[in-house]
């Protein structure tokens, strides 16, 4: 039991779980301050604020962090071509350190000793929230109800939560709950649990909320020119209608709209959680998918081959660290600086077509291009001397010849 005047900042979503947690924390003697981040999710923020106050929150912070989310978290991931296990674009993993930053700032402003969240004890988010909070404020204490026996034994299922909510006047959903859980932000939406826990089950068509069905999407593509500077998108132009956006947030929102219209960004995967288990997740990442393809193309066009090989390794490690919750770790800071340095000449424009669930690169140009049209031309010899290739091939063949010479000897001895 906490002292009556202990204050806790709760990462509040407005949903059933965190509403019940808010009331439960008050039962334990805490003074509760609720924080709800507007990170691009579909939410009635005024209603959520009124609900938290009605349930006994001393104060409710609602902060729009969308621009910060794009510039400080999504853009570094775009520069890195970040993908976890080759497919997941890290939408939830990137949002957590952004939210953690504000949880800590509010706790410090309010003099709160505690931070609380509603993440489950089996998932990655508990790790991401807490590592972020501890890194930014080592003295903070975290309350994680879904890891506390006195909480999860009292509420083993949704039925018990509903009964608790009704008893304490917590508004409960009047519409049937979707048979899966969802988490949404500006970058993506995820679906997991429920009927999706069986990896064999096909996701129903009505599951998807952020993108149109690719098979019924428009029959005319949208063509975009995306301009990059130092690996970051700075301008997008729709070549069909001339619409242009330059600010980070407006650019990203516009790409979300275009990708959503054409059903771009869906993926259904089984991934390895940091806590050790495999889980099935379905994700929609519309704008992120367009930017991944466009950035990958301009990077290959402007970056030295050997530097890019090193950078690919850095990107793999960066993606792993972000997924596992180490955004504020020294190793992740180091990687962000290295990746940013690799992007100094990654500038230019990529022309893409967005159509029927796909992103097609149509062309690219850059003032820093390492592509030499004359050098590579089949019609012009240029500065390249074809005869030089003979020595190059002979030197590279030497190792192969020696290896197979030895293999022949070993094989002969084994046959004797």
From Swiss-Prot:
Pathway: Amino-acid biosynthesis; L-arginine biosynthesis; L-arginine from L-ornithine and carbamoyl phosphate: step 2/3; Nitrogen metabolism; urea cycle; (N(omega)-L-arginino)succinate from L-aspartate and L-citrulline: step 1/1. It comes from Gallus gallus. This is Argininosuccinate synthase. One of its GO terms (cellular component) is cytosol. GO terms for molecular function: argininosuccinate synthase activity; ATP binding. ATP binds at residues 11-19, 37, 116-124. It is an enzyme of class 6 (ligase). Its EC number is 6.3.4.5. Pfam families: Arginosuc_syn_C, Arginosuc_synth.
């Amino acid at each position: 039991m906490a002292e009556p005047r202990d204050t806790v900042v709760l990462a509040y979503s407005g949903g059933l779980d965190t509403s019940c947690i808010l009331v439960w924390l008050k039962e334990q003697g805490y003074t509760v301050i609720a924080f709800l981040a507007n990170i691009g999710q579909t939410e009635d923020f005024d209603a959520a604020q009124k609900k938290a106050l009605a349930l006994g929150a001393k104060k409710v912070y609602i902060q729009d962090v969308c621009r910060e989310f794009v510039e400080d978290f999504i853009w570094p991931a775009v520069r890195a071509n970040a993908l976890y296990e080759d497919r997941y674009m890290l939408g939830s993993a990137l949002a957590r350190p952004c939210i953690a930053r504000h949880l800590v700032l509010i706790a410090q402003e309010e003099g709160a000793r505690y931070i609380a969240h509603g993440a489950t004890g089996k998932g990655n988010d508990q790790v991401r929230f807490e590592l972020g909070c501890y890194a930014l404020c080592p003295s903070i204490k975290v309350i994680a109800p879904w890891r506390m026996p006195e909480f999860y034994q009292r509420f083993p299922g949704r039925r018990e939560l509903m009964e608790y909510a009704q008893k304490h006047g917590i508004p409960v959903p009047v519409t049937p709950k979707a048979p899966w859980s969802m988490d949404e932000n500006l970058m993506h939406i995820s679906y997991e649990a429920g009927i999706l826990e069986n990896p064999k089950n096909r996701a129903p068509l009505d599951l998807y909320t952020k993108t149109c069905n690719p098979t019924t999407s428009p029959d005319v593509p949208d063509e975009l020119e995306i301009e990059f500077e130092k690996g970051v998108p700075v301008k997008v132009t729709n070549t069909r209608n001339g619409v242009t956006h330059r600010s980070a947030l407006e650019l990203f929102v516009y790409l979300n709209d275009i990708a959503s219209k054409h059903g771009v960004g869906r993926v259904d995967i089984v991934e390895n959680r940091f806590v050790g288990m495999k889980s099935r997740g379905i994700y929609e990442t519309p704008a992120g998918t367009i930017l991944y393809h466009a950035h990958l193309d301009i990077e290959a066009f402007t970056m030295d081959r050997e530097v890019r090989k090193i950078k690919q390794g850095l990107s793999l490690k960066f993606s792993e660290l972000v997924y596992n919750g180490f955004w504020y770790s020294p190793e992740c800071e180091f990687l962000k600086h290295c990746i940013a340095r690799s992007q100094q000449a990654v500038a230019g424009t990529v022309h893409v077509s967005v159509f029927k669930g796909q992103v097609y690169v149509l062309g690219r140009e850059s003032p820093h291009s390492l592509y030499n049209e004359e050098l590579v031309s089949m019609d012009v010899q240029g500065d390249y001397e074809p005869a030089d290739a003979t020595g190059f091939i002979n030197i590279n063949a030497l190792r192969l010849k020696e290896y197979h010479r030895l293999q022949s000897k070993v094989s002969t001895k084994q046959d004797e």
